[in-house]
Amino acid sequence: MKSLQKGFTLIELMIVVAIIGILAAFAIPAYNDYIARSQAAEGLTLADGLKIRIADHLENGSCTEDANAGAGEKGNEDKGKYALAVIEGDYAQNATDLKPEDKNGCKVVITYGQGTAGSKISKLIDTKVLELEQLVNGSYTQGDATTLDAKFIPNAVKKSQ
């Protein structure tokens, strides 16, 4: 009488484990990039919220709430879960021929890892900085002091290479 085979052989199981390992080798780094990119996007959301404050401050001729206030003073920052955004810079109020695409002198410096959930931030963006320079038309462009990897910078503010 023939015996029936029940279950899988060891070779079949080893092949399945190897395939899962290969898939995981590609999936885990892609997932880590996805997490870092989503956390980095929070910084741009914070900066967009500061646009209104900057516009209010510009009516008084300064980028910050008080012309004598330094970075981090009340009204000049916004803290999120993964980042801290701070208004800095000197308003170019004496420039007479500024075009909408020119910089107005105001900056928002976003430092990752200084938010309320600092220990849960991706290691790929922790302690990195995204500097956004405000244009006359109110939009932002990437500043030179940026240390955040280009692949994590939102396309809306990324410098054209």
Curated annotation (Swiss-Prot):
Modified residues (N-methylphenylalanine): 8
Disulfide bond annotation, renumbered to this chain: 63-106
Transmembrane segments: 8-28
Compartments it resides in: Fimbrium; Membrane
Chain positions listed as propeptide in the UniProt record: 1-7
InterPro entries membership: N_methyl_site, Pilin, Pilin-like, T4P/T2SS_Core
Membrane topology per record: Single-pass membrane protein
GO BP annotation list: cell adhesion; type IV pilus-dependent motility
Superkingdom of origin: Bacteria
Gene Ontology CC, one term: type IV pilus
Keywords: Disulfide bond, Fimbrium, Membrane, Methylation, Transmembrane, Transmembrane helix
Function: Major component of the type IV fimbriae that plays an essential role in twitching motility, natural transformation, and protease secretion.
PANTHER family listed in its UniProt record: GENERAL SECRETION PATHWAY PROTEIN G, PREPILIN PEPTIDASE-DEPENDENT PROTEIN D
Similarity-based family: Belongs to the N-Me-Phe pilin family.
Record's subunit section: The pili are polar flexible filaments of about 5.4 nanometers diameter and 2.5 micrometers average length; they consist of only a single polypeptide chain arranged in a helical configuration of five subunits per turn in the assembled pilus.
Name of the protein in its database record: Type IV major fimbrial protein FimA
Organism from which the protein derives: Dichelobacter nodosus (Bacteroides nodosus)
Gene, per the UniProt record: fimA
